[in-house]
């Protein structure tokens, strides 16, 4: 099976992690980001995880998020209060991960525009089934990944 899918389950590796992302953001913005991020994988000064493999996976996803928006976004982001930063980080996540975008558009917005504003696990599972029916890569995910 060729990996031509726009989807990834990588979001599950580090979820939202607002505080951790903010702690690492200066490293991402640095001119020597590669060196600093490698040091963070080894020392884990900001990421409180047990091993280098987990730290590496999280930092890989943080880098993807960081690169998904223009550089001047991060200047604006730094000027925001915490609540606005969390909303801005949600925007970055929606922009980075197509599955999260689809959940937002096909589940959250649909619920927002309906009488029932509650999003259930079943709502998300139904959307994932729809995606899975049309994407061989997503369909190949284990049941554990799909949870």
Protein language model features and the residues they cover:
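Conserved phosphate/pyrophosphate-binding and hydrolysis machinery centered on Walker-type P-loop NTPases
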Residues: 14, 94, 143
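Short, solvent-exposed secondary-structure capping/transition elements
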Residues: 71-74, 112-117, 134-138
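Amphipathic alpha-helical interaction surfaces
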Residues: 65-68, 106, 110, 130-134
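Positively charged, polyanion-binding regions of nucleic-acid-associated proteins
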Residues: 87-91, 95-118
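Short, positively charged loop/turn segments that connect secondary-structure elements
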Residues: 130-146
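Eukaryotic partner-binding/assembly regions in large regulatory complexes
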Residues: 1-90
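Short amphipathic alpha-helical interaction segments
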Residues: 50-54, 142-147
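DNA-recognition alpha helix
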Residues: 120-134
């Amino acid at each position: 099976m060729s990996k031509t899918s726009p989807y990834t389950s990588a979001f599950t590796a580090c979820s939202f992690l607002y505080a951790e992302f903010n702690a690492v953001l200066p490293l991402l913005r640095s001119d020597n980001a590669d060196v600093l991020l490698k040091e963070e994988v080894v020392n884990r000064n900001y990421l409180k995880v047990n091993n280098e493999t987990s730290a590496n996976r999280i930092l890989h996803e943080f880098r993807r998020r960081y690169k998904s928006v223009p550089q001047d976004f991060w200047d604006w982001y730094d000027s925001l209060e915490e609540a606005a930063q969390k909303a801005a980080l949600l925007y970055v996540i929606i922009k980075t991960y197509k599955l999260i975008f689809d959940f937002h558009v096909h589940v959250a917005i649909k619920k927002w525009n309906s009488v029932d504003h509650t999003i259930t696990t079943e709502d998300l599972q139904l959307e994932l089934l729809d995606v899975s029916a049309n994407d061989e890569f997503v369909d190949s995910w284990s049941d554990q990944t799909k949870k």
